[in-house]
Amino acid sequence: MKITTIAKTSLALGLLTTGVITTTTQAANATTLSSTKVEAPQSTPPSTKIEAPQSKPNATTPPSTKVEAPQQTANATTPPSTKVTTPPSTNTPQPMQSTKSDTPQSPTTKQVPTEINPKFKDLRAYYTKPSLEFKNEIGIILKKWTTIRFMNVVPDYFIYKIALVGKDDKKYGEGVHRNVDVFVVLEENNYNLEKYSVGGITKSNSKKVDHKAGVRITKEDNKGTISHDVSEFKITKEQISLKELDFKLRKQLIEKNNLYGNVGSGKIVIKMKNGGKYTFELHKKLQENRMADVIDGTNIDNIEVNIK
C-alpha cells in the first residue's frame, strides 16, 4: 500500500508541475492497448496446433484444461477419440456461461423495448449507465484553464476529470487532496474529455460502515393500478454524495420496479434521523450543483418512493 501511495503521489506532483494531462492519458491508453494485444496470441497457438475444433471452446476456460487435453490425446491417438469430445471440461463452461450472462439479460432485453415510453428514453439511458467508485485516492487540482475547475483523479494511471460544481468549487483549493472517494458516471461535455464526471466527491471512511435503510415504494401505473413494495438500500460510507444516492436508487428502481418504462414521474424522499430530508424529482435528472452535496450516510433513517 505504501508503494502504491508513493507512486500516485509522484504522479500527482508530475501533473502539478507539467499540467500535461492529455499526454498522460494517451500514454496510459497506449500501454494498456499494447499489453492486451500481446497476451491474446499467446493463449491460442498451442491449442490450435493439436486440435483445431476443440481448442477454441477451451480458449475461454482456464489454461490448466488446455495442457491436460493434448497430453491425453498424444498417448492414445486412435481409440480414445470419444474421450476428447466428452470430457467434463467441455460440459462445465457451457452451462456456467449461459446461467450467468443469458438468464439476467434475456428478460430485460425483451421487456425494455416494448415498455419504454419515448419521453423517458433519455432518463432511462442515463440512469442505466455503468458507474465507477474510486476509494482512498489522491485528487489533484490545477489552475483554472476554462470556465470550470476540475479535480484530477488518477486510479490505475488513467486520469478522470471531476468537475467542481456547487459547494465543491469553494471546498477544494488548488493542490493535492488525499483520502478522497469519488463516485463517477461518465458524461458528455464541451471540453472534449473522454473521462469526465460531475460531483460525487467525498472523504474516505475513517471506520467500516454497514448501514441499511428501508425503502417503501408506492407505484401507480398508467392504468391507475396502485402497487406497494418494500426493499433495502445498503450504505457503506460515512459520507455519501447526493449524486451517488440519486443514481443508485433510480437504477435500483429501474431494475426492480420498471421506472422509466411506462411511468416516470414522482419523487424519492430521503428521510434523516434528525428530521431532515432530501428530495429527488423523478421526471428530471438531478441538478449538477446538487451532485456535489454530501450527507451523513449513517444518519439516513428511511427512504420513501412515489412513482406515477
Swiss-Prot record:
<protein>
    <recommendedName>
        <fullName>Staphylococcal superantigen-like 4</fullName>
    </recommendedName>
</protein>
<feature type="compositionally biased region" description="Polar residues">
    <location>
        <begin position="33"/>
        <end position="47"/>
    </location>
</feature>
<dbReference type="Pfam" id="PF09199">
    <property type="entry name" value="SSL_OB"/>
</dbReference>
<dbReference type="InterPro" id="IPR013307">
    <property type="entry name" value="Superantigen_bac"/>
</dbReference>
<dbReference type="InterPro" id="IPR016091">
    <property type="entry name" value="SuperAg_toxin_C"/>
</dbReference>
<keyword id="KW-0964">Secreted</keyword>
<comment type="similarity">
    <text>Belongs to the staphylococcal/streptococcal toxin family.</text>
</comment>
<feature type="signal peptide">
    <location>
        <begin position="1"/>
        <end position="30"/>
    </location>
</feature>
<dbReference type="InterPro" id="IPR006123">
    <property type="entry name" value="Toxin_b-grasp_Staph/Strep"/>
</dbReference>
<keyword id="KW-0843">Virulence</keyword>
<dbReference type="InterPro" id="IPR006126">
    <property type="entry name" value="Staph/Strept_toxin_CS"/>
</dbReference>
<comment type="function">
    <text>Secreted protein that plays a role in immune innate response inhibition by interfering with host TLR2-mediated pathway.</text>
</comment>
<dbReference type="InterPro" id="IPR008375">
    <property type="entry name" value="Staph_exotoxin"/>
</dbReference>
<dbReference type="Pfam" id="PF02876">
    <property type="entry name" value="Stap_Strp_tox_C"/>
</dbReference>
<feature type="region of interest" description="Disordered">
    <location>
        <begin position="32"/>
        <end position="117"/>
    </location>
</feature>
<feature type="compositionally biased region" description="Polar residues">
    <location>
        <begin position="94"/>
        <end position="114"/>
    </location>
</feature>
<dbReference type="InterPro" id="IPR015282">
    <property type="entry name" value="SSL_OB"/>
</dbReference>
<keyword id="KW-0732">Signal</keyword>
<feature type="compositionally biased region" description="Polar residues">
    <location>
        <begin position="55"/>
        <end position="76"/>
    </location>
</feature>
<feature type="compositionally biased region" description="Low complexity">
    <location>
        <begin position="77"/>
        <end position="93"/>
    </location>
</feature>
<feature type="region of interest" description="Sialyl Lewis X-binding">
    <location>
        <begin position="180"/>
        <end position="278"/>
    </location>
</feature>
<dbReference type="InterPro" id="IPR008992">
    <property type="entry name" value="Enterotoxin"/>
</dbReference>
<dbReference type="GO" id="GO:0005576">
    <property type="term" value="C:extracellular region"/>
</dbReference>
